[in-house]
Amino acid sequence: INQYIQFLFSTKVETVYNAFISLIVKEDIFGQEITQIILTNYFQKQEINFRLQDNDERISPRIQEINQEYRENFNPLLSGFVHRKVFDDCIEAITNEKSIIISGNAGYGKSGCTEAILNYCEEEKIPHIAIKLDRRIPHKNCESWGHDLGFPSSIAHSIHCVSRNENAVIILDQLDALRWTQANSSEALTVCMELIRQVEYLNYERNKKIIIVFVCRTYDLENDNNINSLFKKQDTLKIDWKTIKVDVFEDDEVKEIIGKNYENFLPKLKNLLRIPSNLYIWQHLDKKEVYEKCLTTYHLIDKWFKQICRKSTTAGLQERAINEVIKRIVNFLDKTGRLYIPKQISNIGEAELDY
């Protein structure tokens, strides 16, 4: 009954429950027909608020803003968005109304999967929302988090109201970041669990299901008990999760992207470039130099970092200033346990930030 009250009312469950008891025990309703008007008037007097109405006009514009914020952070390869078979697996799961856990090592292309899902949702006009949990950290409870995101209710209830008769998709990315960046990660994960339960309950009432997509590094999914406990099935209402693992590029995929020169690379460099994030870095390196000795991700990043600093002079900036900016950012992230730094407290010049 608590879930049903939470579904219908935005006021605290205990307050609504007590109001129902008072209506039965204290009000003069014996022998009367209980109509919607009687209940509505009674709840208004008790200052109890109903939840959102279908197609609430406040929701869709805010969903678009949140999705735009999410997609701004995706950087494809220079050759463009590369279609991969794992994308088809994600789309198939969604068409079968299966909620998904996308896992993979860092840099393996999990964001490519979410980009493919978002493209599919837009093409098929499926209501959807995508959130990076390291930027929009869950806190307190679903209702409070939803308000902070700019919604009149929780994410689950909000998207339910704009998609009651069709499928909808909720993407929650960077689940593993809650473990590494938040001192109170248990609270954030509790909110995620509450959201899952809300979707489970809403789906019980829906013909077309809300589908949840979580994105998490394989290591954290397999080794963090708090994270993998989110997906354990314990009763009949529980969601059936499909885990889709993202791996490195196939050799022929990398060859097609790089071209004929790929055949001349050492085997270790070939394997290194099968990791999508490494290939992205390699594409931004000055091709006039030789990179045969780059055998680890660290080597690639070091080359790229030095190139960025070296070329800063062509933008009218001092190399020392760029080094100082990067050092300041890294120190802030290390001390705060965050993955980003607010611009207003960075004390970094506009020219350096733009560069």
Language model segments and positions:
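Conserved beta-strand position immediately N-terminal to the Walker
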Residues: 100
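Conserved P-loop NTPase "ATPase switch" module shared by AAA+ and STAND
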Residues: 161-192, 218
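Post-nucleotide-binding-loop coupling segment downstream of the phosphate-binding loop, primarily
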Residues: 103-169, 175-177
